[in-house]
């Protein structure tokens, strides 16, 4: 199981195929996504990579956080996240994961925070049908109707769908296809929409419900901290070696 990456949503555009068909894509940018720390079975009880992305001023950071980045010899990061991996998929601390960590044509799962919509009614928030337009209904056309029973149970149950704050939820979209990658600019173009607003932080990982392509690099494509490029062999070549 390979590591994912932390990216920022740039926006949406479209790309054209050789046949002239256009594909709507979301542009995701890797902002110097580096490995900050390892989580091991011996020390933590599980295996994972802690990644960091984006620049952050140290003046706004607690001393403890600054110490963690200093130990890893990594510049302070604005966003930090963990990705569970297998033991053979650990990437050295300080290495920068590149955009071609994902190959064109493979499917990925993306996770982000949905755009906030503020206070919304039942029809917008939960797709309720509303009440009738006439025949005894006045003023309350967009209300949700009854919310509970009679004297028994005498209450409204928890998790009842009602008006309230809409958006700002953690959303995962499955099986988005990678259309293009740009290593020099650190861009990943995925087909379709990605949850969140422009500039929002997105987690991208290999699709859980789709097979990993044979040419996907393991443990990944990354640049070492000393400036050297680590070219990981595709999984098919590693198995045949």
Swiss-Prot record:
Sequence segments annotated as region (Disordered): 139-164, 215-241
Modified residues (N5-methylglutamine): 151
Function noted in UniProt: One of the primary rRNA binding proteins, it binds directly near the 3'-end of the 23S rRNA, where it nucleates assembly of the 50S subunit.
HAMAP family: Ribosomal_uL3_B
PROSITE patterns in alphabetical order: RIBOSOMAL_L3
One of the record's GO cellular component terms: cytosolic large ribosomal subunit
Family under the similarity heading: Belongs to the universal ribosomal protein uL3 family.
Name listed for the protein in its UniProt record: Large ribosomal subunit protein uL3
Any one GO biological process: translation
Subunit structure of this chain's protein: Part of the 50S ribosomal subunit. Forms a cluster with proteins L14 and L19.
Source organism of this protein record: Rhodopseudomonas palustris (strain BisB5)
Modification after translation, per record: Methylated by PrmB.
InterPro entries: Ribosomal_uL3, Ribosomal_uL3_bac/org-type, Ribosomal_uL3_CS, Transl_B-barrel_sf
Protein keywords: Methylation, Ribonucleoprotein, Ribosomal protein, RNA-binding, rRNA-binding
Source superkingdom: Bacteria
Gene that encodes the chain: rplC
Keyword RNA-binding included in the entry's annotation: yes
UniProt xrefs under PANTHER family: 50S RIBOSOMAL PROTEIN L3, LARGE RIBOSOMAL SUBUNIT PROTEIN UL3C
GO molecular function, one term: rRNA binding
């Amino acid at each position: 199981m390979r590591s994912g990456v932390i990216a920022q949503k740039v926006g949406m555009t479209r790309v054209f195929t050789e046949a002239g068909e256009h594909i709507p894509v979301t542009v995701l940018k890797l902002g110097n996504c580096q490995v900050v720390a390892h989580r091991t079975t011996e020390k933590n009880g599980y295996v994972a990579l802690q990644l960091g992305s984006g620049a952050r001023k140290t003046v706004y950071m607690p001393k403890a956080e600054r110490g963690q980045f200093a130990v890893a010899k990594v510049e302070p990061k604005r966003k930090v996240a963990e990705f569970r991996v297998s033991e053979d998929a650990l990437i050295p601390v300080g290495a920068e994961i590149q955009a071609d960590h994902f190959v064109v044509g493979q499917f990925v799962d993306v996770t982000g925070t949905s755009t906030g919509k503020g206070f919304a009614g039942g029809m917008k928030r939960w797709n309720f049908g509303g009440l009738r337009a006439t025949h005894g209904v006045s003023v309350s056309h967009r209300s949700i109707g009854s919310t509970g029973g009679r004297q028994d149970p005498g209450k409204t149950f928890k998790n009842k769908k009602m008006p309230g704050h809409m958006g700002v939820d953690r959303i995962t979209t499955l099986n988005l296809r990678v259309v293009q990658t740009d290593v020099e600019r650190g861009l990943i173009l995925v087909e379709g929409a990605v949850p969140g607003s422009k500039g929002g932080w997105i987690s991208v990982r290999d699709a859980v419900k789709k097979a990993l392509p044979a040419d996907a690099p393991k443990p990944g494509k990354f640049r070492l901290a000393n400036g050297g490029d680590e070219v990981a062999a595709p999984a098919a070549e590693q198995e045949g070696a």
